[in-house]
């Protein structure tokens, strides 16, 4: 274990012990008072931001309310305590007990983590939840994070995203060449191989980068969040579908020592709070996106466009190569890929005669 990880873990342990000691007074009937805990939670999102930001905060507030204050959580938005992309490190070191973000932000540390946010042309929200909760995905996720002293939980999903905002038309595959676009995860590598330049930026920097021309295009989430950022004021063309993020799962991560210090009832509360947010957030997006899309349709400065078929076909083909290469160089990714696609193949067959068939008939 690295020295900073050891010291960070000791900091978490010291906080837990000190808090438990303070609460060890006896209750009125002579029995020990329940232990209480004081945690800090960092996120990758702007403060009070619709959907992801509010959803992340709801995990903390639900835990505190359901525990009757036995777990108090101080919540920090992205950049307030640690940079937006350093949530994983802060929790892994034990600097804080808890974090909320997206697993594909950690690809430089653990490539296979990208499976637990989104794979281009992969699972949607419903399928991700089925795989994680019932198909063995969550067990693989926890196995992957164990060396980092982290316990992950699914804690939100935006639903299928939009393809992004562009300051140039995409009429063919050739139009992707030289395109400088904010796009993370495997989607970014796919764009690079298609001739573009992927850029990773936290949400708070996207508008300025797009408005000033530092980037030519950006994906963010969908109408609900994109209007909140004013992206419709920074670019003209709004493309769909979101091939790169069909059902991105967000994560809540807890430092292992902090997790193991909790009694069984508080562990259940943490798990259920994450699950509650995982259910509510997609509903928030389905509602918010429907309303925001109407606003965008009324905005004459915005053109809503579908990616050409040849562009989608090329991106899908590249995705297969990227995923295969990831598995070839990373045994953990190979195990996860096998489980992921085994379930996706079964689910896709079912979707074609259920959800997909219904939507085509509606």
Where on the chain are the PLM-derived regions?
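N-terminal secretory/targeting leader peptides
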Residues: 2-128, 138, 143-362
